[in-house]
Amino acid sequence: MGVRAQQKEKTRRSLVEAAFSQLSAERSFASLSLREVAREAGIAPTSFYRHFRDVDELGLTMVDESGLMLRQLMRQARQRIAKGGSVIRTSVSTFMEFIGNNPNAFRLLLRERSGTSAAFRAAVAREIQHFIAELADYLELENHMPRAFTEAQAEAMVTIVFSAGAEALDVGVEQRRQLEERLVLQLRMISKGAYYWYRREQEKTTIIPGNVKDE
């Protein structure tokens, strides 16, 4: 990469970081202006268009980066798990670290998931589906259950994790610790329930129909 290309990438990075830095509990992406972001990044507003077509393209880039960042962290967590330790507790701790270190990235995913922009909603939905798919892959490999079961389990887990993350954004250390413990318990219950349901479905093939009540 030449010097000019490096400088362009550096400026593009500055714009993304500037936009993230202006998000908060009180301020959403929709309230940001091109001028504010450019000023924070240290460039003229007109220079913004050398890097992004408009503010929406910047926002979509931020959504992609937020989702990728979270998935990479969870992959690292699974690598740590391979060396020993609780799968669920290590994953929850890693997720809460992400919330603590990147609150605005998670805020963006939460808000745009149900925002007014169809493009943003679709982008967040894609990121969440990537997250679910990677978790389902892991569960299928580790638990030796059919894909339909691991996908259902992964979707339930991700839904609860995102809900807990929303609560964890603006609470103190002790409250976050309590949330973490509750989340570990909830995920273990889902995991046990998924395994029980799978075993129950397996047993149906060896039991005379009608002897087991549907729950």
Curated annotation (Swiss-Prot):
Keywords: Cytoplasm, DNA-binding, Fatty acid biosynthesis, Fatty acid metabolism, Lipid biosynthesis, Lipid metabolism, Repressor, Transcription, Transcription regulation
One annotated GO molecular function: DNA binding
DNA-binding region, residue range(s): 33-52
Subcellular localization(s) per the UniProt record: Cytoplasm
Pfam families recorded: TetR_C_46, TetR_N
GO cellular component terms, A-Z: cytoplasm
Gene Ontology BP, a term: negative regulation of fatty acid biosynthetic process
Domain HTH tetR-type: 10-70
UniProt cross-references to SUPFAM superfamilies, sorted A to Z: Homeodomain-like (SSF46689)
Gene3D superfamilies to which the protein is assigned, alphabetical: Homeodomain-like (1.10.10.60), Tetracycline Repressor, domain 2 (1.10.357.10)
Source organism superkingdom: Bacteria
Subunit description: Homodimer.
Function: Represses the transcription of fabB, involved in unsaturated fatty acid (UFA) biosynthesis. By controlling UFA production, FabR directly influences the physical properties of the membrane bilayer.
Protein name per the record: HTH-type transcriptional repressor FabR
Name of the gene encoding the protein in the UniProt record: fabR
